[in-house]
UniProtKB/Swiss-Prot annotation:
It comes from the Bacteria. Part of the 30S ribosomal subunit. Contacts proteins S3 and S10. One of its GO terms (molecular function) is rRNA binding. It comes from Methylorubrum populi (strain ATCC BAA-705 / NCIMB 13946 / BJ001). This is Small ribosomal subunit protein uS14. GO terms for cellular component: cytoplasm; small ribosomal subunit. It holds the Pfam family Ribosomal_S14.
Amino acid sequence: MAKKSSVEKNNHRKELVKRFAEKRKALLAIANDESREMEERFEARLKLAELPRNSSATRIRNRCEMTGRPRAYYRKLGISRVALRELGNRGLIPGLVKSSW
């Protein structure tokens, strides 16, 4: 089980990303638009730098919904390999069978 503070920190980052998504997208569009003047693009970059660091999507860590584990994360299911194995052994994931050969 991951520390509650780590999970909460990540949840706070997700919230910030949602809150600043539109503003960040608009500023990036201005900054990357080569048809605009260099000064205008530079100002957009400065405004982008003033946004909170945690409002960037790259700072979000994929974590298991059940345990908060940050590694061995299956995106399709939203859980870690450990949680996947536990649920699979209990028969709670349809179509998942233990392999044997």
